[in-house]
């Protein structure tokens, strides 16, 4: 649920998040994550952007992270497509000032959002719309708004409607800022 209050309740291993009486999410410490691949170069990432699926093919064109209907500052506009020379998808991202805290650093919730959709495009979202079922991640640093970053995603596995992916955000020179491991579920065809 967006643009509405969510009730947060402390649980044994983390937190539970409720929309009214409906449990919509849980959180818990993620523990160790495997190291991500080396970062694609900014040029490879820009090449990935040029291979992002066409706007009319996007299942969720108003998505905050990857929606082509979003304007700069209203959404992240991450358009991760297959990047030549990198086994996955990538894009260059320059976080807008609207996504920074008072200290000029990109807010953690924005980094978590940026880790989301690249995983879907790495596992075939353009062909089969999916939703995120689980994400585990680590934020290693908070970049400054206006920094030139590289966002990447890669495929781990496919099992029926389940798909595993990893994502990462790197500095322009390849230093890891944040990473995630994800489980995506294909939507059932109508």
Where is each model-derived feature located?
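Hydrophobic beta-strand-centered segment that forms part of the acyl-chain substrate-binding groove
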Residues: 1-5, 9-11, 112, 116-151, ...
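A structural microfeature
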Residues: 25, 178-180
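Surface-exposed, gly/pro-biased binding rims or lids
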Residues: 181-190
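A mid-sequence, solvent-exposed acidic-amphipathic segment
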Residues: 73-140
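Non-catalytic linker/capping segments at the edges of enzyme domains
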Residues: 12-103
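Short aromatic-glycine-enriched beta-strand elements
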Residues: 13-15, 161-167
């Amino acid at each position: 649920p967006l643009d509405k209050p969510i009730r947060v309740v402390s649980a044994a291993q983390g937190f539970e998040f409720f929309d009214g009486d409906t449990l919509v999410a849980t959180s818990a410490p993620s523990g160790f994550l495997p190291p991500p691949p080396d970062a694609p170069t900014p040029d490879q990432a820009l090449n990935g952007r040029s291979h992002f699926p066409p706007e009319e093919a996007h299942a969720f064109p108003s998505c905050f992270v990857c929606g082509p209907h979003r304007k700069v500052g209203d959404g992240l506009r991450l358009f991760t497509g297959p990047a030549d020379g990198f086994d996955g998808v990538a894009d260059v991202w320059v976080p807008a000032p609207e996504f920074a805290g008072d200290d000029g650093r990109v807010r953690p919730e924005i980094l978590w959002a940026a880790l989301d959709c690249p995983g879907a495009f790495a596992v075939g979202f353009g062909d089969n719309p999916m939703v995120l079922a689980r994400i585990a991640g680590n934020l290693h640093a908070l970049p400054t708004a206006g920094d030139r970053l590289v966002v990447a995603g890669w495929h781990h596995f496919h099992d029926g409607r389940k798909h595993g992916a990893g994502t990462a955000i790197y500095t322009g020179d390849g230093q890891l800022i944040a990473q995630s491991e994800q489980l995506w579920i294909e939507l059932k065809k109508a």
